[in-house]
Amino acid sequence: MISSKVAPGEEEEQQEAPAEVAPAEEELRETEGQLEAVPPDEASPSWATGPPLERLPPVGQEAPPPRRCHTDCLEAPLSSCFLRLGALVGANPWLFLLGPVLLTASLGTGLIFLPKEKENLEEQYTPIGSPAKAERRFVQSHFSTNDSYRFSASRTSSETNFASILVVSHRDSLLEPEAFAEVSRLDRAVQALKVVQENGTQILYPEVCAKYSVGCVPPNPLLFSWQQNSSLNLSELTFPIHSVADHLIHLAGFFGGNVLGYATTGNRQRLVESRAMRLLYYLKTEDPEDRERSQAWLTHFLDHFNDMKSDLALEDIEVVYFTSLSRQLEFEATSKTVIPLFHLAYILIILFAVVSCSRLDCIRNKMWVAVFGVFSVAMSVVSGFGLMLHIGVPFVIIVANSPFLILGVGVDDMFIMISAWQKTSLTESVSERLSNSYSKVAVSITITTITNVLAFYTGITSSFRSVQYFCIYTGTTLLFCYFYSITCFGAIMALDGKREVVWSRWLEKPDQKYSSFKKFCCVPFGSFPDEHGDDNHPMNLFFRDYFGPFLTTSKAKFIVVLIYIFYIISSIYGCFQVQEGLDLRNLASDDSYITPYFNVEEDYFSDYGPRVMVIVTETVNYWDKDVRQKLDKCMTQFEQNEYVDKNLTEFWLEAYMQYMNNTGNNPNDKNTFMNNIAGFLNFFPVFTYDINVSSSNEITSSRGFIQTIDVSSSSNKKRMLLKLRGIAENCEVPLMVYNQAFIYFDQYAAIIENTVRNVMIASTAMFIVSLLLIPHPVCSLWVTFAIASVIVGVTGFMAFWNVNLDSISMINLVICIGFSFDFSAHISYAFVSSNEPSVNKKSIEALYLLGYPVLQSAISTIIGVCVLAAAKAYIFRTFFKIMFLVMFFGAAHGLIFIPVFLTFF
């Protein structure tokens, strides 16, 4: 990502060219690209683009003894290999250009395997092997359901087909006959929807609705009662349970925005006002044929709901809607919104590359080389993605972020190689120039590739499949970027080098006819390009002559320290404010119809959470009084929990004890206890699917239900889940808690653990790499400091930018480690390697050598992902936000904090 460029005149480091490349004596050569003789003692200045190389001893002299901190154990062999590779590419440019092109064309055929089927959200965005998935398997294997006869939403183990409508009154309350009349019209219109299939058959709501007894499950129990008896007094309702003709109606979860009055019987309160109502249309799901017909009805519902709402001309109420299909459909539609941004991203990167690589003279100008360099990066994306699809790695929507990142990161190697080329002498052959350029950039582009690829591949250890697949795709594509940079792009540079030779010879011709044109177009400053490669970029001079001296003044250091203190305090505070977990509404685009639905649900229906099963997982002696007392004790602990409403507990055993007492039977006798269960279920059929009796007349498992409250935030969901599981685990009776929502709630408990583990693994990998390639203790310390500081900063400022800690942001935190390493390792190494006498001058020299490459790397990456800021989906905007924070804080550490802090030690 960053070039560690050494300016001319700072250290007269020279490296003897190999015998096969550089001649041993001065002679005029006719080699292609050779302009004039180059005496061996007038070699061009060395431009190191990695950590400075050890000076090689003159031929025939004994090498000096090694220094204590010998740093070229890997660097020297790597540079030697690249030197030979550069000579080979320079001698055969067309081979190394066409080879990657053909490889890209071959691997690109894998794009035909881009998935056409639906992406499983649960599989991709919930933790692998989460406890809730094991709990679900237990429920499915021990408890049956029947959505064609006795459906109960709280007893289902997985999400069923449904359509949900939230009705919000324009008045203070909808508990008025006029409002109920409008809602009733809406309800009848929904139930009247019918699907006409291609074969002419119709799918009617009564055919696909989930049933209890012989009728469809009412979408709202109070509305159903009012429809049966319009004289029902809506001003005398009790909450959360209301009695209608000796029948209990649960209003909790069906009415929101409530104003409660005085207490009535028991623990009920008078329902004075209610602003919102929920209508839930449950459909059959268990039978595959029924499921298909239900989904066809839901699709028809989605296609025609807005037209139906317009036809009804509802005046007193506003409605929003959502179905069990909505999240999946909207998630798939989200990916289409980002496709146009690819074109904009490539245009911006090409413009940036052209501006960065343009020169005023036509010989050194690398405008078209930069353009082809961007296409080389695009080839790596096609190759990497094609290879992954060929071997069957699933492509998930989050991977669509990857090309934007690769585009920004991939061009960094291009800038480094062009910079090294510009430092070579025009008097050398193309092969020699490319060979020298390769040897200079070997360590720089290799170390940045290794660190970034390692950072991504550590993400494979994540518990989220979406993170695994993103990291596999991106890490592999970065390897292709590296491979194409040293082959395809090197060949492009070699071909452009031949162009330089042709133009140079043309400029040298004493042709008076074109002299004015030459001066105006090709040599605007009236002098020929420097043949020895002295190419001081204005930005390098800015860091050396202005920024560096200013930053090392006492006042500037004091201000920098204050800024850092403010930065780290703010970041630590923000770390404690970060929300955990992926809000499922964020999987859809901003203009999706599900967004207002979730907003209304959060505003009016957040008081009551999921209804949780409390499952006795093993055979216990329910007729034993001690066992019942232990079980009652555990149920009391559940009810006393801050996230549980004790008034809405439902447990068959409690009802059975009352039944046994009313019938005068002894509940402490096994035979009496077991023989009366059948009669009990006849009176209370609702408990039929809560007791699992084996053929040997043993209760192998049973369940009750508790109602959760106040779990609207992700932190409360996490605490509720952990506390309920803790109570179940500590109970003397084997218990388990489960609700289908726990499948997604588990991410809240897993995300921090996964993030910490991935960050630790990646940081350890970076530390090992730093010791191997730049083994200086001071460098390792500053690399560790920078990584920790940037991670804390990015995590903290995520909270200020309304970004959750989820599987998407976890990816970026892993990326953060690679960039922090790049920005800090080179700066600190340049500082400790400097021969300047004072720490201030060492810092200035480090900025002179690396300030512009750090800035260029940050800008190119930000440009690559900045178009995602215009995306209409959270998952893409989040990627931009965090990458911007990573680049901004990483560059700030490399350009400001570390150069200042190094002067204090």
Swiss-Prot record:
Predominant location: membrane
Tagged with keyword Glycoprotein: yes
Q: According to its UniProt record, where is this protein located?
A: Cell projection, Cilium, Flagellum membrane; Endoplasmic reticulum membrane
Keywords annotated in UniProt: Cell membrane, Cell projection, Cilium, Endoplasmic reticulum, Flagellum, Glycoprotein, Membrane, Transmembrane, Transmembrane helix
Flavoprotein as UniProt keyword? no
> Which residues lie within the region annotated Disordered?
1-67
Regions crossing the membrane: 94-114, 337-357, 369-389, 391-411, 441-461, 475-495, 558-578, 759-779, 781-801, 813-833, 849-869, 882-902
Q: Which residues are glycosylated?
A: 146, 199, 229, 233, 647, 661, 692
What is the protein's membrane topology class?
Answer: Multi-pass membrane protein
**Tissues with expression:** Expressed in germ cells of the testis (at protein level).
One Pfam family from the record: Patched
Q: Name one GO cellular component term.
A: endoplasmic reticulum
The similarity annotation says:
Belongs to the patched family.
What this protein is reported to do is described as: May play a role in sperm development or sperm function. However, does not appear to have an essential role in spermatogenesis or male fertility.
Put simply, this protein is called Patched domain-containing protein 3
Q: Name the gene behind this protein.
A: Ptchd3
